[in-house]
């Protein structure tokens, strides 16, 4: 198994884990988002999951996410477009050149982005040992692929917003920590921290001083319900949804987000000061 197997076209089911619970999200035949939460300690978890799925389990692939701090990444801006074979050759060359780790101990993947002038190649690699340790957390469920957490977070934000804002900063927080990600033309900027969102934001703008036009925030329900929740700036826009955020992003791996139907799910875009009053910002 690699970080992502691009030839896999089975029914995708996004998975995330919180304590003993496993959260599953998938798209039905009408591209409507479906979800369920199950106790991950159940011995026969498949018998509980199967009635909800659109296809048989052996026709599904389960997608999880791994923290970017466990991976190595590099972005290349190349003068011309590469085909799949050339991309793979370029990845292998860069990994052998820059990492003191044998290729057979790594899983790697890449993303390609055509530019007006040139071609962007994003390379990600992870030790197989680290990936296997992450996969073991989900057992007895066997994941098919691991994507990067920052990729999943961006997809979830984009799907809920119904757009892919440029020069926007996306902030995510759960009990494990905080993550900031901003998609630029030349690179994807990512920063993780165990601090609060305000401190992470300050660290981010010091490291990446480019202009930020809008800031979007998602905090998991347990963070929002905490008595020690921090006050956020008035111009930050908070995303709220009844869907498990990471599982949603995982489910949308390699999916055309324009087709995703969230009409049956509760989502809201609020300013931090309006959250308790429930005022939704259009």
Residue ranges of predicted features:
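Hydrophobic/aromatic-enriched cytosolic interaction surfaces used to assemble or bind macromolecules
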Residues: 1-282
